[in-house]
């Protein structure tokens, strides 16, 4: 009850500065808002009476619940300290400071920055009324505690932990977010967490940042991922990238790619082009070297290792004898007949 009361007081203080911009009943106004009651977000109708306590659902999810930070996923494994201080931020003026001494990682950080900003912009892609201009400045500082200048490589020994602090500057007109990590992967996870602490308030049409945060986080498991079988069901490069985006959002780090099997062989092997020529579902459903490299790089930027699973040539489908009978131990027809006789 005490925590809910503190949340309620913080919300009321935040709302007092925003009432002048709201006119209930205008076209395209949000009809419903939310209140935090017993650690749950309950919907209420926005009226002249409730406008002072109503908050948007994203803001309610940020502040309400048993966890100190409701929108961060997965839940941090270490310290989580927050104060319910919301700051209207201008996402067009966010600045970044990356470790410039690690020159081989700069392109990865630049790509991570662009993805971070695109994630924030996606909150308002479908809104009818554009967000209000203005807001406070946010500076994101990333510190990597390593002097080794090399392209990051994710192994079972990689330290993916990070510490994150967000603090408002004096005067309340800006905030600074500091990430400290021992590897690119930990720093990237910290950047992902910051993106989860910025929500779009569709009632006040502003981006809001939880501006007083301290988080220490590290994954419980070294191998966290999914398996996708594209030998039985072909997925386009675009679809695979969309899957990698989803993995990155929840800090999973492994894409186990089952790329070939008896159903199809969509993998380009330059020394044996007949494999994908006769083994793929169609000429357009082939993963070339360039496409695979593109997916591997796309995953690296997002802190994901791409692990390819290759089935041996004998498990390629029945069209392989047309390509090169010498590469086949037993055809699928003979294999099926053998099992039928057993």
Predicted features by range, described:
Residues 2-222:
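Acidic, contiguous N-terminal accessory segments
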């Amino acid at each position: 009850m005490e925590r809910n009361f503190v949340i309620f007081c913080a919300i009321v203080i935040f709302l007092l500065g925003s009432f002048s911009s709201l006119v209930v009943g205008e076209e395209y106004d949000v009809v419903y808002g939310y209140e935090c009651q017993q650690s749950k977000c309950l919907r209420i109708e926005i009226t002249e009476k409730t406008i002072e306590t109503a908050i948007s659902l994203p803001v309610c999810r940020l502040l309400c619940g048993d966890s100190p930070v409701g929108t961060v996923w997965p839940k941090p494994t270490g310290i989580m300290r927050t104060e319910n201080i919301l700051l209207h931020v201008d996402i067009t003026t966010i600045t970044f400071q990356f470790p410039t001494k690690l020159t081989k990682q700069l392109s990865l950080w630049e790509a991570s920055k662009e993805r971070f900003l695109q994630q924030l912009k996606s909150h308002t892609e479908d809104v009818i009324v554009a967000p209000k201009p203005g807001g406070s400045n946010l500076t994101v500082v990333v510190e990597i505690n390593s002097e080794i200048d090399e392209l990051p490589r994710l192994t079972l020994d990689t330290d993916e932990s990070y510490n994150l602090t967000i603090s408002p500057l004096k005067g309340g007109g800006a905030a600074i977010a500091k990430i400290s990590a021992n590897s690119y992967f930990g720093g990237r996870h910290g950047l992902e967490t910051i993106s989860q602490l910025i929500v779009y308030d569709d009632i006040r049409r502003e981006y809001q940042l939880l501006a007083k945060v301290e988080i220490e986080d590290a994954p419980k498991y070294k191998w966290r991922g999914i398996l996708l079988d594209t030998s039985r069901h072909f997925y386009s490069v675009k679809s695979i990238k969309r899957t990698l985006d989803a993995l990155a959002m929840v800090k999973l780090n492994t894409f186990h790619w089952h790329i070939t099997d008896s159903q199809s062989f969509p993998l380009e092997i330059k020394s044996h082009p007949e494999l994908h020529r006769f083994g793929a579902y169609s000429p357009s459903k082939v993963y070339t070297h360039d496409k695979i490299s593109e997916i591997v790089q796309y995953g690296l930027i997002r802190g994901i290792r791409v692990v390819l699973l290759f089935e041996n040539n004998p498990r390629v489908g029945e069209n392989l004898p047309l390509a090169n009978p010498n590469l086949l131990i037993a055809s699928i027809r003979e294999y099926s007949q053998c099992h039928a006789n057993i």
